[in-house]
Amino acid sequence: YILEESYLFLDWYLAANKLITQKGHLKKNLKKIIDNLYLNLKIKHKVFVHRDFHVSNMMFYKNKIALIDSQDAVLGNPAYDLASLIDDVRIKTSNSFKSNILKVFLSKFNYKNESQFINDFEILSVLRNLKIIGIFTRLAKRDKKRKYLKLIPYAWKLIDNRIKLNPNFHDLKNFLQKNPRIKKI
């Protein structure tokens, strides 16, 4: 699911960027980079993944947190929903707050290999935010819902924050440095 959904970035955002679409090989290169990121996911066991796990889909019910909007749930990587929650484009939080949530989560769930979990968390956050940029571009272009465009700069900021240090993002970092981001969709 995440790999195919990441291609929404290619199909909509890159298509809106005339400079890149004039050079078809750039789309192929970015697809290969996305595919390689997906292949670098380390955790192979699957768990329930809500896929739309964010504060707006949580509510208190009988003194417990309940989730709504789970019709698109799948079996997938255990880091996906946490990446959705921590790097949600609709809610701006500090990097220290994000880091603290991740630390608390890891302390509660006792993963055997925390570095594998963090690796997957970062990759899934980036892939998910690329997907979101693609979806928001599609909403603007196809459905004339332009209100989501204002969230794209923060999605880029979330991506930039995640790709800084992880060596898995070397090729993506180079691609993004060499190719301009769309200023207006």
Predicted regions and their residues:
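Active-site activation/catalytic loop segments of kinase-like enzymes and analogous catalytic loops
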Residues: 7-17, 78-112, 126-143, 155-162
